[in-house]
Amino acid sequence: MTVPPVILIDILKRPSLLTSLSEQHQSAILTEARHVNLLGQLQYLCHQHDVFDDLFLHSQQTLLSGQQAHLAQCKQLNDYHNVLTQALTQATSTWSYINQAGIQFSQQQSRLGYLRQTTEILVSHNAIHHIENCLLTHGWRPKLISDYDEKSRIRYTNALSPFIHQESNLELVVHYQLLPKRFRYSNNDTFTRKLIYPDSCYPASIFDPISTIYHLAINLFFINDSKFGLRDIFTLYSLLNENSLQEGFWGELLTFQNKVGKDSSLFLALHFCHVLFDLAIPDFVSQYYHQQFKVSVTLNSLETSYIDLFSYAFPPYQDDDYKLAARLLRIRGCIKQMPLYLLLPHIIKRGIWNCLPHESEEELIC
């Protein structure tokens, strides 16, 4: 399929473009948005830029369905929180909702329309076995995983295998450390998060905006968890753009970067948010990152691959360049997460594993 001259990533940068498209082209954009879980956020964006009323009726109805899905998921998350609280309070006094669930529990405008795939929590390493037993006795069961990449990701990201709640089908991922095992501070990562305690998820906590931004950047650019790459980079842009209005935000961000050292995840997040969505970055922040990182070497090798990955994730647009970019970035993620002597066996095992027949995910969840 030939890629149209205007695709979703163009609309996210300039929502007004949507009003100049035919009804069929608008429908194609919204289909792409639904595929990458951005339909609800696009609806909010259209209202924010006063273009919603100028769209075709069918497009308005489709966008409203994304908003309704978001509202239903927020209500569902509150119900899930009650189920989790019942199970976890017997094993631990507190836990943190992280990544997608943490964003939905936050009170920021950037969460409006946001849809998550899984619910992830962070617990104390010392309580992990007690928590696992409590989940098993409260209607949870381990999820069978047939995808080798997902099995490897869990192995190298300090998480238990996901759990499925037998009644609600909630999928839960329990982390006992946040940073990947090969990361410099993986065994002592408490300085990478600052907790806040909204009433909506008591007695649990969520991360403050800078901690949330950093760990989203780690997932996208260190672990290379890019299945929903466009949604995640746009979420990073939304969080950065909204919080940049707060006095002292950029100074706090650079202080945070000094603590984590040479990891380039935040740098890459800022760069691609600027390139793709025109994020306004102060000169002193740009100068800092240009001094800290070998910008030309880092970006020349990554920029084209990441832009292809973010732009053409919709299956009809996936050409050979996209597939090559996805493969190269997956290998980059493997290299970052495991020693080199394990990389070749991993690639061989992945090829063999994914050629074998496995039960479908639908069969496993039912």
Show the residue positions of the predicted features:
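Conserved NTP-donor binding/palm subdomain of two-metal-ion nucleotidyltransferases/polymerases, i.e.
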Residues: 1-117, 123-366
